[in-house]
């Protein structure tokens, strides 16, 4: 349903995990380079440009379809399960209740992969699944969305910021080439984004993932509008800068709610992915932070397992929480402020928006900092 803007660091992790090669083998054209990015405000053609020339890379990042990432991840886990026999996939069975923490019922077998822990065999977390079965493990990890029911079941609260907006996402072809430049356009009354995809390998048409953000009630009519009228409407909303536009995919809508958990860990429990931080998409860091959380936690688990230490120890989980909070909390707060400022329509806010954009363009060190955050040079 949507394209993922991926930093160079995330692309590197994807390669290490074997996912990049799987996607490339399936559809090489699905890996689209994101060379530059520009930020626009209102109807002005002026933009703040974050170019790859500010870095030592030929692109800032990459654009990959979310469904291809999911498919590759499933295939990689399935292959590992068949190769090692120590992984069990139980799909479509959400956790309905966390039954216990700490000493669990005697006689129950530990979950797969719990061997090698220094903790006693009774020190486990037990969960009840929708099919009525119970399972025990030394560590329970929630990766079930920013509104994580597992996080809630563990008694971990979260601060939520509802932006009162919904974004509509779809793929479209367009006449004017995008030159692999991403757009973030804070127009008046709407926010637009363009994520550049590779040209259609069959027709040669220019393609992009387009994102339109509006108040909830104004998105609904666009979801059911006929395709020709929708193309005309989107061309108008992009002020004709992409020429004629044509819908080439289904349309998807997502309410914009930022979520920051009060904690990332509890007793024998950790949050990763969107369950660890739910970002506003304006900085395109949601997936990247999710992948970072998995890598950070995995680092801690590997070190503990290699030295025979408990993979669910309070010290290990505290280190993970500190590392990931430090990596994500500052940008979460900055993103929330940016999204609020650039959707405020009052006259003083419009002046401030314009001034900030011009200042950012003139202050090259700032643009280099943004570019470095995308390429992983920080």
Where do the protein language model's features map onto the residues?
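Glycine-rich phosphate/pyrophosphate-binding beta-alpha loops
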Residues: 191-193, 257-260, 276-288, 326, ...
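Central beta-strand plus flanking loop segment that forms part of the substrate or channel wall
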Residues: 12, 18-19, 147-183, 190-192, ...
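Conserved N-terminal helical subregion
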Residues: 23-26, 31-153, 161-166
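C-terminal helical "tail/cap" subdomain of flavin- and related membrane-associated enzymes
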Residues: 299-378
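Active-site metal-binding loops of divalent metal-dependent hydrolases
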Residues: 145, 269, 275
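Glycine-rich FAD cofactor-binding loop and adjacent beta-loop-alpha segment at the N-terminus
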Residues: 1-34
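FAD-binding beta-loop-beta segment adjacent to the flavin cofactor pocket
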Residues: 254-271, 329-330, 340-341, 346-348
């Amino acid at each position: 349903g949507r394209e993922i803007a991926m930093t160079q660091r995330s692309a590197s992790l994807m390669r290490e995990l074997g996912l990049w090669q799987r996607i490339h083998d399936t559809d090489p054209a699905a890996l689209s380079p994101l060379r530059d990015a520009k930020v626009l405000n209102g109807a002005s053609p002026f933009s703040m440009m974050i170019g790859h020339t500010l870095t030592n890379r030929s692109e800032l990042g990459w654009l990959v379809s979310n469904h291809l990432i999911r498919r590759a991840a499933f295939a990689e886990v399935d292959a590992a399960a068949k190769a090692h026999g120590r992984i069990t996939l139980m799909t479509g069975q959400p956790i309905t209740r966390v039954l216990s923490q700490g000493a669990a019922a005697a006689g129950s077998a530990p979950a797969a992969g719990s061997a090698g822990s220094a903790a006693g065999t009774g020190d486990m977390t037990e969960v009840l699944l929708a099919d009525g079965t119970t399972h025990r493990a030394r560590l329970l990890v929630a990766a079930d969305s920013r509104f994580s029911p597992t996080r809630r079941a563990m008694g971990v609260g979260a601060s939520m910021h509802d932006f009162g907006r919904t974004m509509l996402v779809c793929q479209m072809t367009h006449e004017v080439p995008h030159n692999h430049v991403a757009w973030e356009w804070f127009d008046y009354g709407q926010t637009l984004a363009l994520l550049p995809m590779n040209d259609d390998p069959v027709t040669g048409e220019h393609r992009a993932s387009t994102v339109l953000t509006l108040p909830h009630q104004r998105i609904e009519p666009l979801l059911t509008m006929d395709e020709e009228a929708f193309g005309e409407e989107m061309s108008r909303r992009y002020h004709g800068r992409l020429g004629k536009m044509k819908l080439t995919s289904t349309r998807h809508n997502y309410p914009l709610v930022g979520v920051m958990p009060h904690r990332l860990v509890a007793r024998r429990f950790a949050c990763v992915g969107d369950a660890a931080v739910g970002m506003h998409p304006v900085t395109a860091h949601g997936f990247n932070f999710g992948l970072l959380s998995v890598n950070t936690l995995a680092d801690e688990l590997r070190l503990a397992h290699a030295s025979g230490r408990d993979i669910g120890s309070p010290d290990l989980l505290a280190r993970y929480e500190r590392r990931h909070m430090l990596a994500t909390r500052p940008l979460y707060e900055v993103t929330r402020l940016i999204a609020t400022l650039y959707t405020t329509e009052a006259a003083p806010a419009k002046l401030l928006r314009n001034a900030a954009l011009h200042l950012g363009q003139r202050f090259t060190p700032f643009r280099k900092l943004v570019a470095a955050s995308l390429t992983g040079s920080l």
